[in-house]
């Protein structure tokens, strides 16, 4: 039985849906039992970067060089530090639209990037 990565759960209320390139947040206000739903769609490279960071940068800093190699070059895309900065900025903007804190992605100047999240859970399904 093969297991395939479907996405991730960040904290308890944000789901990363890889196949549909979506981030979905479902939060509730307990006093009124109201559910709030917010969702954003990500471009291909932005989603690839997010998947890479969720997989590799939750417990240590991942170098810019490693990110450029794995996210850009291994997907036959042209890589540069400027392009990395642009895509990280776009990802941070999308994350903020669904209520993620600005410091979810931390840039360690001269080193690389790390995620600031207490709980990232990969979600798999049977093929």
Language model region names:
Residues 70-78:
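Short helix-coil junctions and helix-kink-helix linkers
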Residues 2-20, 40-41, 86-126:
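DNA-binding patch around the recognition helix
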Residues 61-63, 79, 100:
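Alpha-helix N-cap and coil->helix boundary residues
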Residues 19-38:
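Short, Lys/Arg-enriched N-terminal segment that forms or immediately precedes the first helix
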């Amino acid at each position: 039985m093969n297991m395939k990565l479907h996405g991730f759960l960040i904290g308890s209320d944000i789901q990363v849906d890889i196949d549909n390139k979506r981030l979905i947040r479902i939060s509730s206000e307990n006093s009124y039992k109201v559910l709030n739903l917010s969702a954003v769609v990500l471009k291909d490279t932005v989603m690839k970067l997010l998947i890479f960071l969720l997989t590799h940068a939750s417990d240590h800093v991942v170098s810019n060089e490693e990110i450029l190699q794995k996210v850009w070059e291994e997907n036959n895309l042209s890589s540069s530090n400027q392009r990395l900065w642009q895509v990280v900025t776009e990802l941070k903007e999308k994350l903020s639209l669904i209520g993620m804190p600005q410091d979810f992605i931390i840039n360690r100047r001269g080193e690389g990037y790390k995620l600031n999240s207490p709980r990232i859970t990969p979600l798999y399904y049977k093929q």
